[in-house]
């Protein structure tokens, strides 16, 4: 069973092929992973369809946690338009993502997803191989206005049942190896460390303090 991590930077956009999904939404094929899983772009969403059973570890509010029965994972740009605010389709973020999954044509109970204000056409896809192991990262991000550093003063409070702010750095990490859940969690930590290292190499500053950013405020 192949492992996949979905969490909340380095490559070029890969042009693909276009066809029409059964919902009538035009989709573009972006990439086929070493596992046989395929990534598509559906207008403002990127969906990775699993070819077989997958161990999925996700930090998403929508169907997050550890699961072994998911069929896909998606990343969605929530902006109404370029430079415009993000759209909420329901009173809660969880229900908002459930509606999005249905719109794309997915089964909400069998997927997990992430929201962002980053443009899907700017996705970065990178695969690295060592011997029999291949790791693929599918990343969207942008922290010009929301870069933050661990330890910065909090500037946002979300009471229960209020919409969440949408995230700004989203990573889908696919590992073509069968790992126990604890090792998969360790890989997620290493992925987070790599994200922070990439941000600091860019010398991106926090918008809430004088230090370098370690991630986004969301």
Give the location of each predicted region.
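Extreme N-terminal basic, low-complexity initiation segments
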Residues: 2-4
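Alpha/propeptide regions of enzymes that mature by internal proteolysis
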Residues: 6-218
């Amino acid at each position: 069973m192949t492992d996949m991590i979905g969490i909340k930077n380095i490559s070029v956009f890969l042009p693909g092929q276009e066809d029409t999904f059964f919902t009538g939404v035009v989709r573009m094929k972006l990439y086929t992973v070493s596992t046989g899983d395929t990534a598509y772009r559906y207008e403002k969403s990127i969906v990775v369809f699993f070819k077989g059973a997958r161990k999925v570890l996700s930090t998403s509010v929508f169907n997050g946690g550890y699961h072994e029965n998911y069929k896909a994972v998606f990343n969605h740009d929530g902006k109404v338009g370029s430079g415009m605010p993000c759209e909420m389709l329901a009173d809660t973020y969880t229900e908002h993502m459930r509606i999005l999954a249905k719109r794309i044509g997915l089964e909400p109970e069998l997927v997990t997803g992430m929201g962002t204000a980053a443009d899907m056409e700017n996705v970065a896809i990178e695969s690295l191989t060592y011997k029999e192991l291949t790791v693929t990262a599918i990343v969207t991000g942008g922290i010009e206005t929301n870069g933050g550093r661990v330890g910065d003063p909090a500037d946002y409070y979300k009471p229960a049942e209020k919409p969440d702010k949408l995230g700004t750095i989203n990573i889908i990490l696919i590992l073509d190896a069968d790992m126990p859940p604890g090792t998969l969690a360790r890989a997620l930590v290493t992925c987070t460390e790599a994200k922070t290292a990439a941000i600091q190499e860019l010398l991106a500053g926090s918008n809430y303090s004088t230090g370098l950013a370690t991630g986004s405020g969301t």
